[in-house]
Amino acid sequence: MKFVIKLFPEIMIKSESVRKRFVKILTGNIRNVLNKYDDGVAVVKHWDYIEVRSKNEENRAILIDVLGRIPGIHHFLEVDEKPFTDMHDIFEQTLADVGASLENKTFCVRVKRKGKHEFSSLDVERYVGGGLNQAIETAKVKLSNPDVTVRIDIENDHMMLIKARHEGIGGYPIGTQEDVLSLISGGFDSGVSSYMFIRRGSRVHYCFFNLGGAAHEIGVKQMAYHIWNRYSGSHKVRFVAINFENVVGEILEKIDNGQMGVVLKRMMVRAASKVAERFGIQAIVTGEALGQVSSQTLTNLRLIDEAASALVLRPLITHDKEAIIAMAKQIGTDDIAKSMPEFCGVISKNPTVKAIKEKIEKEELNFNFDVLESAVQNAQYLDIRQIAEQTEKDVVKVDTVSVLSANDVILDIRSPEEHDERPFELAGHEVKHLPFYKLSSQFGDLDQSKNYVLYCERGVMSKLQALYLKENGFANVRVFAHGNIN
């Protein structure tokens, strides 16, 4: 099984030294991610493409899925590589591989060639195309918009028959740009803005300001872990949780109502700047869009930025909400965001849309900055992979089981895409599918006389959701111990 990885076009136009560095980084990223699923995979870099090989045919579906989510890959080709002797041998091998798929179809043959041969690419197209047309009575040659395009790449004495083309997400490989710190709230905007910087080649760390208690933090951790695991699992990143409840309390008590929203955002970027400085991160990323809410006018955004010592970047600044939601759906964060309340909006009833600097600074003189300093000093710093370990400690009242009773139902909480690609079954036991992001709204509708054992491939979401359900009064929930079984 072989895949040929084609690079993002902007990589191709870089200088030779930059291009080599980018390709080297992308090769390492691909290897780091694929080794989690197939420890026998081989990744080899070439000048203008990267080659991925595996002997484990059963891993085909997961490798295709994962390659389609690695930044830096424009598209990749699934190929069947074989040696050949002459043009007739190329024709015979092509007929054996694709003949059945051309029945009752129109087709054309396209060839790319490297190396020294006695024939040209056009010669091969004509010879193979003519041969297929004669050998398959119901097939017909059509050079424009055919039903099937037979693609063959020839390099020296080997031919590659292209079986399928799969699209990547493009962008730059992670690690080719500097790190950023994303202020993630769990809503549509912050998830999408985080993804946009991942796709642009930055390693994205996450900073969460907790305004809503344990349930809010669990939801945000789910989103951050989902984005990291799907799109940037090649790199270690940090998840920073800062309890902002006392900061909000100080604002509610001492700041004029109309200025609360801007002051809160200024406190957030001050705190985030301290975190960024600690880890040598150059920029803060937010999901703000111009005019979307009262604090997001140009006047207010400028005042917010003045409180930051780090560069503040807003990739969604000109995006419509509809476009942002569509992108959230594309990357798989929309359902998580739908269940996440917006806490910032509840603290100011009559927010100003054009804050005055002198007035904001005067209001902040009433604020006890020791409260902000304490919040930053007591921040929780996690390697995002430790979310599972931390949850293991938190979910002390949730049983982990490997042997099931007759009253136990396995609840597969993976996303629909993961469920469809790798269905989970266990002989003798009922398995239901309910995506993790629907548990909060639909778990109560299940038969509560049953015990539900949560299943996901790595166990992280199962443990997070078990904690959430326990906190909401559901005692009939446990975690499946063999969460890494496919």
UniProtKB/Swiss-Prot annotation:
Q: Which residues form the THUMP domain?
A: 61-165
Report residues binding ATP: 183-184, 265, 287, 296
What subcellular locations does the record give? Cytoplasm
User: Main site of residence?
Assistant: cytoplasm
Where is it found, in Gene Ontology cellular component terms?
Answer: cytosol
Superkingdom, according to UniProt? Bacteria
Enzyme active site: 456
- Set out the biological process GO terms recorded for this chain's protein: thiamine biosynthetic process; thiamine diphosphate biosynthetic process; thiazole biosynthetic process; tRNA 4-thiouridine biosynthesis
Recorded hits in SMART domains, A to Z, give: THUMP
What CDD domains does this protein's entry cite?
PPase_ThiI, RHOD, THUMP_ThiI
Q: In which pathway does it act?
A: Cofactor biosynthesis; thiamine diphosphate biosynthesis
Database matches in SUPFAM superfamilies: Adenine nucleotide alpha hydrolases-like (SSF52402), Rhodanese/Cell cycle control phosphatase (SSF52821), THUMP domain-like (SSF143437)
Per UniProt, which keywords does this protein have?
ATP-binding, Cytoplasm, Disulfide bond, Nucleotide-binding, Redox-active center, RNA-binding, Thiamine biosynthesis, Transferase, tRNA-binding
This chain's function reads: Catalyzes the ATP-dependent transfer of a sulfur to tRNA to produce 4-thiouridine in position 8 of tRNAs, which functions as a near-UV photosensor. Also catalyzes the transfer of sulfur to the sulfur carrier protein ThiS, forming ThiS-thiocarboxylate. This is a step in the synthesis of thiazole, in the thiamine biosynthesis pathway. The sulfur is donated as persulfide by IscS.
Per its UniProt record, what PANTHER family does this chain match? Answer: TRNA SULFURTRANSFERASE
Q: Which family does it belong to?
A: Belongs to the ThiI family.
- This protein is called tRNA sulfurtransferase
Encoded by which gene? thiI
